């Protein structure tokens, strides 16, 4: 099992012959159900599914269910971050772990693009989403020279699985690839917890009080993009 971002892995094995017995599996951050399992909770998700299937409201349990969902959005599904939260129950310390992960990703982005364009595009995801524009506006992040020959950089970013691309399509039916416009896209961080940390990247660390306010839904910051 090879761990790390796919950028590092591909760089490290690019000259190694891959045996035919190798089976490649894609690993993703924990989803909400897996996160609840890590929290020792195997009952909530089946219960939510029952209510959804029956199309009935949660009632008094809704507030706790939303708080648990916000906790997942803040911690995210990266195993190191989840372990830190389980060990410390401290969102600020968990944030420090997520910052280390993001720093590794930024280092990897600089490996594939030494001009720093990939890293800059990644760092600008929160601000671009906050503009509520129809697509990622590369022109507001990179100058004219930086926007030249960008398709290869974007392809490497997509292959890294650190970011997710959502492409515009005029006819989003079967055969989506026939109608998608790869010049018209939005870019998202692949993990909600990393997105929250990246949104507060201007601070040396995200204070525990900020996390607590986000968790209790009392901070004015728009959580819509985390959803």
Where in this protein do the model-derived segments appear?
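Conserved Walker B catalytic segment
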Residues: 1
């Amino acid at each position: 099992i090879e761990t790390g971002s796919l950028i590092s892995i591909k760089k490290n094995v690019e000259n190694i012959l891959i045996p035919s017995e190798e089976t490649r599996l894609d690993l993703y951050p924990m989803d909400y159900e897996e996160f609840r399992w890590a929290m020792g909770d195997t009952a909530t998700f089946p219960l939510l599914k029952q209510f959804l299937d029956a199309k009935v409201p949660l009632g008094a349990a809704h507030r706790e269910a939303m708080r648990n969902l916000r906790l997942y959005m803040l911690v995210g599904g990266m195993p190191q971050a989840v372990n830190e939260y389980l060990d410390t129950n401290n969102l600020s310390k968990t944030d420090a772990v997520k910052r280390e992960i993001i720093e590794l990703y930024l280092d990897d982005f600089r490996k594939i693009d030494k001009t720093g364009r990939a890293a800059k595009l990644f760092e600008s995801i929160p601000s671009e989403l906050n503009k509520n524009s129809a697509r990622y506006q590369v022109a507001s992040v990179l100058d004219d020279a930086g926007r030249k020959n960008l398709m290869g950089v974007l392809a490497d970013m997509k292959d890294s699985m650190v970011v997710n691309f959502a492409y515009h399509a005029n006819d989003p039916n079967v055969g989506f690839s026939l109608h998608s416009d790869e010049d018209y896209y939005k870019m998202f961080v692949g993990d909600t917890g990393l997105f929250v940390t990246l949104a507060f990247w201007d601070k040396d660390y995200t204070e525990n009080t900020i996390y607590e306010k986000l968790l209790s839904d009392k901070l004015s910051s728009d959580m819509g993009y985390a959803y």
